[in-house]
């Protein structure tokens, strides 16, 4: 009896046929055992995926329940922040402004001193209106 290639057999049917016929038996037995092993592995993987999804769902439900349990405390904290916001200290901007004023003041003083020293002292071109040495 020739084996028909167009018929798709399930792994169990293939194993049964392989045990029944001796001509194509070893090939069908091997393919049947491998097919059963593959089906088992696929079923195991599907079960593991289902368990993982179920565990993930349980973890998500537990996290949601915890969030709902903490909701009154969170609302109370939010209301307190809105009613009386915490006072923040503004030390850094004041410090930066003070340093900027000091640097500008120091720069102005240095500019003034350097400018005075760089100008030569020329005698005035007009005669003095008052005599420098009084007569006795």
Curated annotation (Swiss-Prot):
Cell compartments where the protein resides: Cell membrane
Q: Which residues cross the membrane?
A: 94-114
GO cellular component, alphabetical, reads: plasma membrane
- Keywords of this protein's UniProt record, alphabetized? Cell cycle, Cell division, Cell membrane, Cell shape, Membrane, Transmembrane, Transmembrane helix
An example GO biological process term is:
protein localization
Its membrane topology, per UniProt? Answer: Single-pass membrane protein
Pfam families reported in the protein's UniProt record: CwsA
Q: Null-mutant phenotype, please?
A: Deletion leads to defects in cell shape and polar peptidoglycan synthesis. It also compromises polar localization of Wag31.
Quaternary structure, from the entry: Interacts with CrgA and Wag31.
Q: What does this protein do?
A: Required for regulated cell division, cell wall synthesis and the maintenance of cell shape.
> HAMAP family of this UniProt entry?
CwsA
Family, per the entry?
Answer: Belongs to the CwsA family.
Q: What is this protein called?
A: Cell wall synthesis protein CwsA
Protein source organism:
Mycolicibacterium smegmatis (strain ATCC 700084 / mc(2)155)
Q: What is the lineage of its organism?
A: Bacteria, Bacillati, Actinomycetota, Actinomycetes, Mycobacteriales
């Amino acid at each position: 009896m020739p084996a028909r290639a167009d018929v798709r057999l399930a792994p169990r049917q293939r194993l049964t046929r392989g045990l029944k016929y001796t001509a194509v038996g070893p090939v069908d037995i091997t393919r049947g055992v491998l097919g059963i092993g593959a089906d088992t592995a696929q079923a195991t993987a599907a079960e593991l995926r289902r368990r993982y999804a179920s565990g993930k769902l349980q973890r998500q439900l537990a996290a949601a329940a915890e969030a709902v349990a903490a909701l009154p405390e969170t609302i109370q904290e939010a209301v307190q922040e809105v009613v009386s916001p915490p006072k923040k200290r503004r030390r850094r901007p004041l410090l930066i402004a003070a340093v900027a004023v000091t640097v500008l003041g120091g720069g102005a003083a240095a500019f003034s001193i350097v400018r005075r020293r760089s100008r030569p002292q020329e005698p005035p071109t007009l005669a003095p209106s008052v005599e420098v040495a009084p007569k006795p």
